Amino acid sequence: RPEELSAAFAEAKAEAQACFGNDEMYLEKLVLRPRHIEFQVLADRYGNVIHLGDRDCSVQRRNQKLIEEAPARCLTPELRERMGAAAVKAAKAVGYENAGTVEFLLDPDREHFYFMEMNTRIQVEHGVTELVTGVDLVRQQLRIASGLALRLRQEDVTLQGHAIECRINAEDPVQGFRPCPGRVDFLHFPGGPGVRVDSCLYSGCELSPYYDSMAAKILAYAPTRMETIRRMRRCLEEFTLEGFPTNAELSYQILYHPEFILGECTTAFLDEHLSELLEFSRKLSESGVDAVSYTHL
């Protein structure tokens, strides 16, 4: 709370002095209900740096992304250009060489954005960028690592269509997203035009409890955002995994929520709406109908 800031700051200074012999402190701006917007960059050892557009990763639980999409619906062309230029400038400033992601927080007025971090690797959600740009990011990363110069120039990068990714995690949203690894008794992934699935699972395999709970990534692509949303809904209708709980049903319900359809989700979305989403699922479960089947009917 604001009234506690002064005392907390003094306490933190004392702790820093006691632990590290240095009580220097800095303050970061608190951005309430921001959007999580990130830019994919490629940089070679010859100083060539480009960005491949943006991703909106605001639908999260415990600061871990659940649904990602490209491009971000909330960005104007002017803001996209400014944020992309900032991402490229940041990568150049540190002499970066690799594929990477520059992540920002965008405040509610959609005018001011703040650097959060840079992920110096290929990210889980890189597939949505590949779908809207047609650029194979892993191939580009291997070329960079081999010492080759980027062939792509910024003017070569165009964003076409819309892509959405849903992470399928072995976890139970009803139990506070408790990890639920185990044996895959039966598995069926969706398919068809504009659908991509990245996973190593198969019927009969064991999902280990010793690693991340993510079991698969389902991606959908179409010419427009609404078409992509409909395609992803169909993907989650077709997806079947028997053996342990996943978050697939929750993601399916999110795709029907008005805030998601309008592109208005912030990082606070699940905190604000999880109870109602789970309550809907619970009522259907008590009636003997799962949410996916209900909505499909």
Question: What is each PLM-predicted segment?
Answer:
Residues 12, 37-39, 101-104, 128, ...:
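Short beta-alpha junctions and helix-cap segments that line functional grooves
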Residues 1-32, 62-76, 82-95, 149-152:
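Conserved ATP-binding module of the ATP-grasp superfamily
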Residues 6, 44-86, 122-137:
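ATP-dependent carboxylate/phosphate-activation module, predominantly the ATP-grasp catalytic core
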Residues 41-43, 54, 106, 120, ...:
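Flexible glycine-/small-residue-rich
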Residues 26-31, 36-43, 95-123:
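Conserved metal-phosphate-binding beta-hairpin within the catalytic cores
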Residues 87, 127-297:
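Catalytic cores of soluble metabolic enzymes centered on carboxylation/carboxyl-transfer
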Residues 52-63, 105-122, 187-208:
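Flexible glycine/proline-rich, aromatic-decorated loop/lid segments
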Residues 3-14, 81, 85-92, 116, ...:
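Solvent-exposed alpha-helical segments within well-ordered globular domains of core cellular machineries
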